[in-house]
């Protein structure tokens, strides 16, 4: 029997989000974390069908739309990409909220979105831009040294912004859209060095995002973010910007409520600020998403790549 998966695609600052509206199997009525675990354990091929070629792309982030646990929440969502599952996704949440409005599910205002790492608060503004009040962000360790194969010693901060990041300012790389290959090679080597050295986030959390920062003539900073699976973020990265704000706050370089304009490697911009909280900060990220497609993915029984090209 042919499988059908309904999707709506959007992009946030150039970074695509694929919202899965229907077609996935039931994951039960647990929390988003529990449902994510069921999806990963029992139905992972649905993730690969949506995200991997020939129907998807390494760049894309998937977002499975779920009924929320709390009646006060507008939706639940499980994020995933070509390599696995994400706890939270800032650009993806912006895309999800914009798409929920397109579907007629929400109007401008404040909405709660359940994710595997907690409930985030998102505001859909009248101009259809979206502000996401993220989960607690904090710096776990400062100036951690790691030996990077082929590059030598590198120092960076380890911070949580919804995913684990290694943030580097002194890297000697040119952060520009025409230098992505070199940036990817360098960031991949950093991640390999962290893994070899056994350097992790809190409680052994895998540091699967590498973030490089540089000065920018028009904005506060420009960044390159390597995501899990070796794809880079076209957007400024919501969770990465949250992690950056946590480091700035810890160093006393950014006061609560002051807007930080973070540019991506391709020039798209998020506006970010934070409120102080016990154990860290609560960041708010504002950006815009645009709709790009509505489609039904078809998976024929005899298609050898129906569930994706899995390497």
From Swiss-Prot:
Binding of substrate, residues: 90-91, 209, 233, 238-239
NCBIfam families on file: PRK13970.1
Positions annotated as active site in the UniProt record: 89, 237
EC numbers on record: 5.1.1.8
Sorted UniProt keywords: Isomerase
Pfam families given in the database record: Pro_racemase
Protein name, entry field: 4-hydroxyproline 2-epimerase
Top-tier EC class: isomerase
One example GO MF annotation: 4-hydroxyproline epimerase activity
